[in-house]
Amino acid sequence: MSADFERRFGGLRRLFGVAGAQRIFDAHVVVVGIGGVGSWAAEALARSGVRRLGLIDLDHVSESNINRQIHASTATLGMSKIDAMRQRIAGYHPDCQVDVLDEFVDAENWPALLQGFRPDAVIDACDQIRAKTAMAAWARQSCLLYTSPSPRDLSTS
């Protein structure tokens, strides 16, 4: 672990214990959809010391995103959301490996998209309900940690 990493995230050991903090540091989490929910989820994970993130989204930052998406600013207008988020994370957590996939997730293509990541956990923040239900069913069957912050409880398994 680098000295910078230790100074930035070492305090988590006092909060979660050595083993608990190490589980957070070693986690590989994929966030599907880097918009109003997903950008904040990715931010929280990176600021919590997670050292490997996967970000999946096809959209680009627009002015209408600025009021609710943490990576959206005048400087990032027109950038892909995944690149804007990766750039933001690199500014405060350079030890975080951020893998990006510039794809739209739907009910048919998500298994192939997630297969390349092999995550420990998936946060579903995509907009498409059919994709959400398909991913939730798969996660339950695979015993994979999965959450979908949504108004309907499709969520945790």
What are these regions (language model features)?
Residues E103-N109:
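Conserved SAM/SAH-binding loop
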Residues H28-A46:
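Glycine-rich adenosine-cofactor-binding loop
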Residues N109-F117:
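Short amphipathic alpha-helix with an adjacent loop that forms part of the alpha/beta core around
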Residues D120-P149:
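E1/E1-like adenylate-forming module used to activate ubiquitin-like modifiers
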Residues M1-V29:
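N-terminal charged helix/coil linker that caps or initiates catalytic domains
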Residues S48-R52:
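Conserved S-adenosyl-L-methionine
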Residues D57-Y92:
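Glycine-rich phosphate-binding loop and adjoining beta1-alpha1-beta2 segment
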Residues Y146, D153-S157:
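Single conserved hydrophobic/aromatic residue that forms the stacking wall/gate
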